[in-house]
């Protein structure tokens, strides 16, 4: 995943502020209709499909996501695969599509997604949304 792209034309400088024109959207309803604008995301990046499958098997067998990332990931391995908080528009489009669709979960019981990008094969989990 390496380098982040700057979001172009993201317009509003507001950080999670409420829309004055959308009065009937409550806190939760606004998130459901608009979706998260940033996620706290981890991933395991593998160049080879076989290595990704090995990592997936360990996670499905109950291994901690961070521990598997440290063992298998070719990117961010030392941080347990953590990319930190990322805003919409700053990640690879294919990666972002999968990541923003995932439910939040913990490293000990991750809800994961998979995607292949120009960088390789990713196993993705999301720890938080806002």
Curated annotation (Swiss-Prot):
Domain of life of the organism encoding this protein: Eukaryota
UniProt xrefs under InterPro entries: PIN4 (IPR043323), PPIase_dom_sf (IPR046357), PPIase_PpiC (IPR000297)
GO cellular component, one term: nucleus
Statement: the UniProt record of this protein carries the keyword Ribonucleoprotein: no
Region of interest (Disordered), residue spans: 1-38
Keyword Cell inner membrane among record annotations: no
Catalytic activity of the protein: [protein]-peptidylproline (omega=180) = [protein]-peptidylproline (omega=0)
A Pfam family annotated for this UniProt entry: Rotamase_3
One BP term from GO: rRNA processing
GO MF assignments: DNA binding; peptidyl-prolyl cis-trans isomerase activity
Stored Gene3D superfamilies: 3.10.50.40
Record keywords, A-Z: Isomerase, Rotamase
Compositionally biased tracts (Basic and acidic residues): 16-31
Enzyme Commission identifier(s): 5.2.1.8
Residue ranges of every copy of the PpiC domain listed in the record: 36-128
Known role: PPIases accelerate the folding of proteins. It catalyzes the cis-trans isomerization of proline imidic peptide bonds in oligopeptides.
Family that this chain belongs to: Belongs to the PpiC/parvulin rotamase family. PIN4 subfamily.
The name this protein goes by in its record: Peptidyl-prolyl cis-trans isomerase pin4
């Amino acid at each position: 995943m390496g380098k982040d792209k700057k979001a172009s034309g993201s317009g509003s400088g507001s950080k999670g502020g409420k829309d004055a024109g959308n009065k009937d959207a409550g806190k939760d309803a606004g998130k459901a209709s608009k979706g998260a604008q940033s996620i706290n995301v981890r991933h395991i990046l593998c160049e080879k499909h076989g290595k990704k499958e090995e990592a997936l098997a360990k996670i499905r067998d109950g291994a901690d996501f961070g521990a598997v990332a440290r063992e298998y990931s070719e990117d961010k391995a030392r941080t347990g695969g953590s990319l930190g908080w990322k805003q919409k528009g700053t990640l690879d489009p294919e990666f972002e599509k999968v990541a923003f669709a995932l439910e939040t979960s913990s490293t000990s019981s991750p809800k994961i997604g998979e995607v292949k990008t120009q960088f390789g094969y990713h196993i993705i989990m999301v720890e938080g949304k806002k």
